[in-house]
Amino acid sequence: VVTDPNITIKDSDKNNVVKLFLGISRGRSAYKGTDIMWEAARDICKKYPDKISLRVVEGLPYHEYVKAMKDADIILDQLYSYTPAMNSLQAMSMGIISMGGGEEEGYEIINEKELRPIINVEPSYRSVYTALEHIAQHPEEVTMRRQQSVDYVRKHHNYVHVAKQYEAFYNRLVISK
């Protein structure tokens, strides 16, 4: 994933509305948990209309989708995953927090001991709702998680770093033959 080397994360104002983003891909909604996340987000927005907003997009071309996502603080993605997928990683590279799969096992696999940018949720309405309510009540956490999101992608998913890992793996295979 490519990250903007000049990206800066501004401090969140406690009075700012936390902006949620949900991209819908109709053919994939059922196995991504979009329906559950959407319902929880709608309910939180009703309860905290002055603290949380939700933008939902559907069927956009990729470049328009990325542009639409830019103003978000949090992307709702991959409820049934243990780790962030490419959509979340792209968002995280832009300083957007991922809410979805962020299990400890995922951090252990990549030996990440400090960064915890992802708002990990279990695959249930209650878990998503509770996590969103926490953010509504603690918007001061947004700035830290946004910065950690960028740091996480730079550290573990930078395209040059990943290419070097593939090259090293390939060379080990070739040498072992």
Where are these regions (language model features)?
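Conserved donor-binding/catalytic core segment of Leloir-type glycosyltransferases
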Residues: 2-32, 38
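A charged, aromatic-enriched C-terminal amphipathic alpha-helix characteristic of glycosyltransferases
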Residues: 140-171
